């Protein structure tokens, strides 16, 4: 697949593009929507300078910071998740790299969550090959590590971690036989070519991602992008085109409509489902920011006749 081929797919008449994406989607998936909730186990004071992120220690934002939660409180949430019918429990921590002093505790938590009969997922920043192997041995099923944007636009968003470091982490995850979860953020001021190049980078990953989070910028006051923009720099038609193109390129991946969904109309979300979205974050909170409400999601899923497959991520 080349950049020009991706452009050609994206530029097809919108109805034709959505129809092709829907046909591919229906061939590989049923009528279910994966519902995920995201738990932050360590919040804020991150040394990274990602210009969109309120958890960066470089910026003055109003988030409530906390250190790594204790094991018992995390396991209590995991048990509640299982009792509610969840199949997977995912934990996110605001680290550039997991501290050595916390690694064994996180690995132990993964093992105990796994022993509850749940699938496990974490996002902990960069990890090396040895750490990936140990996480796999602890029972880890999925690791999330987003590329965020194209290689070319990346230096405009992050300077504390090189793009190739992200690729290396994904390579370590894949080599350890852990499922890869990897996507990006739209509406940060990137060009269309940057979006196409992001898709090309995802196609060239060491292992095909099992799930692809598609985020739109949530401008948070105190962050550089939050002070620059009042909303995501992408319109609904561009978003739907991007999703449909992603579905065509990744027929067997779960496409998750993630951050920014609370700012989308029900009609826009419906078009996103038609274009290939089959996973959403479910719950009123998404890490540190508000998410679409549970009542709103229940109303929309019922209206569309979509079946929910509840997981806690």
Swiss-Prot record:
Transmembrane segments: none annotated. Pathway: Cofactor biosynthesis; biotin biosynthesis; biotin from 7,8-diaminononanoate: step 2/2. Residues 28-258 form the Radical SAM core domain. It catalyses: (4R,5S)-dethiobiotin + (sulfur carrier)-SH + 2 reduced [2Fe-2S]-[ferredoxin] + 2 S-adenosyl-L-methionine = (sulfur carrier)-H + biotin + 2 5'-deoxyadenosine + 2 L-methionine + 2 oxidized [2Fe-2S]-[ferredoxin]. Its EC number is 2.8.1.6. It comes from the Bacteria. Homodimer. NCBIfam families: bioB. This is Biotin synthase. The lineage of its organism: Bacteria, Pseudomonadati, Pseudomonadota, Gammaproteobacteria, Thiotrichales.
């Amino acid at each position: 697949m080349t950049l020009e081929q991706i452009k050609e797919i994206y530029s097809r008449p919108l109805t034709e593009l959505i129809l092709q994406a829907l046909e591919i989607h229906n061939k590989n998936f049923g009528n279910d929507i994966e519902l995920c909730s995201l738990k932050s186990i360590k919040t804020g004071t991150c040394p990274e300078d990602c210009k969109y992120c309120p958890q960066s220690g470089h910026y003055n934002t109003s988030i409530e910071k906390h250190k790594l939660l204790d094991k018992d409180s995390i396991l209590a949430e995991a048990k509640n998740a299982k009792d509610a019918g969840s199949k997977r429990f995912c934990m996110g921590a605001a680290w550039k790299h997991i501290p050595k002093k916390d690694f064994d505790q996180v690995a132990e938590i993964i093992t105990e969550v796994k022993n509850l009969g749940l699938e496990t997922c974490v996002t902990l920043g960069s990890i090396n090959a040895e750490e990936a192997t140990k996480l796999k041995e602890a029972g880890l099923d999925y690791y999330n590590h987003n590329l965020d944007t194209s290689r070319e636009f990346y230096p405009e968003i992050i300077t504390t971690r090189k793009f190739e470091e992200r690729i290396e982490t994904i390579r370590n995850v894949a080599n350890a036989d852990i499922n890869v979860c990897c996507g990006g953020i739209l509406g940060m001021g990137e060009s269309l070519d940057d979006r196409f190049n992001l898709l090309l980078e995802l196609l060239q990953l060491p292992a095909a991602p099992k799930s692809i989070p598609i985020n739109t910028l949530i401008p948070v006051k105190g962050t550089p992008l939050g002070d620059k923009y009042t909303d995501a720099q992408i319109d609904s038609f561009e978003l739907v085109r991007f999703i449909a193109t992603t579905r065509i390129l990744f027929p067997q991946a779960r496409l998750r409509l993630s951050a920014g969904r609370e700012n989308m109309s029900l009609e826009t979300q419906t078009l996103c489902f038609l274009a290939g979205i089959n996973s959403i974050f479910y719950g009123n909170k998404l890490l540190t920011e508000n998410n679409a409400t549970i009542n709103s999601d229940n109303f929309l899923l019922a209206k569309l006749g979509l079946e929910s497959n509840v997981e806690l991520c």
